[in-house]
């Protein structure tokens, strides 16, 4: 049973997340041969103040 975790900054619409889950599921199905019913996709959304690059939070870089 494939498990896929997508980590991204918050702010996407439900429609964007729905499309993402559908496309990731299809890619895993085509690549691994796993049945759609066995593929699990997690979306973890992060706030910009909980994510940093080069020692700086993204919320501080705006």
Curated annotation (Swiss-Prot):
Record flagged with keyword Nucleotide-binding: no
Top EC group: isomerase
Binding site for substrate: 9-12
InterPro entries in the cross-refs: 4-OT (IPR018191), 4-OT-like_dom (IPR004370), Tautomerase/MIF_sf (IPR014347)
EC annotation from Swiss-Prot or TrEMBL: 5.3.2.6
Keyword Transferase recorded: no
Pfam families membership: Tautomerase
Residue ranges of the TM segments: none
Miscellaneous notes: The mono- and diacids apparently bind in different orientations in the active site of YwhB, but the highly stereoselective nature of the YwhB reaction using a diacid suggests that the biological substrate for YwhB may be a diacid.
Quaternary assembly: Homohexamer.
The protein's role, per its UniProt record: Catalyzes both 1,3- and 1,5-keto-enol tautomerization of the diacid 2-hydroxymuconate (2-hydroxy-2,4-hexadienedioate) to produce 2-oxo-4-hexenedioate. This reaction is highly stereoselective and produces a mixture of stereoisomers, where the (3S)-isomer of 2-oxo-4-hexenedioate predominates. Also catalyzes the tautomerization of 2-hydroxymuconate to 2-oxo-3-hexenedioate, however this reaction is slower and occurs after the tautomerization of 2-hydroxymuconate to 2-oxo-4-hexenedioate.
Protein name as it appears in the record: 2-hydroxymuconate tautomerase
Organism this protein belongs to: Bacillus subtilis (strain 168)
Gene this protein is translated from: ywhB
